Amino acid sequence: STWSWSLGNNGKRQFIMSEIVHAFLGRPDLKQVEIRLDNESREVLLGLVKQFRSMLIDDSDQSLQRLYPPAYLKDSELNDEYDDLVHDDLLKEKLESIDVLEKTIWLESIELEDFFAWMQVINSLRLVLGTRLNVSEEDEFDFGQIHNPEQTLFVWLAVLLEEAVIASNFSLEDFNKT
């Protein structure tokens, strides 16, 4: 399967990175995060999430393996046992996070706990797409050289994740005070 999305009425497959300065803004006074994505970005994210849900349920796409890393690198039998024990729980957690994102995608602000579900989904999407693009931790993108829509999407998800971490940082400060 391939990632797809469309914006606008012309039906063309395209992707536009949002012009908004910060996609998320932490509100420590309310223990919430403000979602500042424009409608097109929310539509793109929602479309990706729907495709991701289908991929998870189908469970045949090899790029999903990045979401379930092996616990035992040198013992496939132990790793299979571990996978049998945890796979269904991990899948359930991912599907529940998708549910949260889908239910809150159009809200202006969400509770921090719901935002952590957003972060999990965005990170999972980034990992799966990165696997498909054969991206490694050593890779650096030259923004002037990105012509592939999937690369643009990967970078956008990485930026969203970075901004999500920054926006939720106040929760770590509160945690460290206790």
Identify the function of each model-found stretch.
Residues I16-L90, V100-T104, E108-I110, D114-A117, ...:
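Charged, alpha-helix-forming regions
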Residues S4-S6, M119, L157:
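Short linear interaction motif-like sites in intrinsically disordered regions of transcription factors
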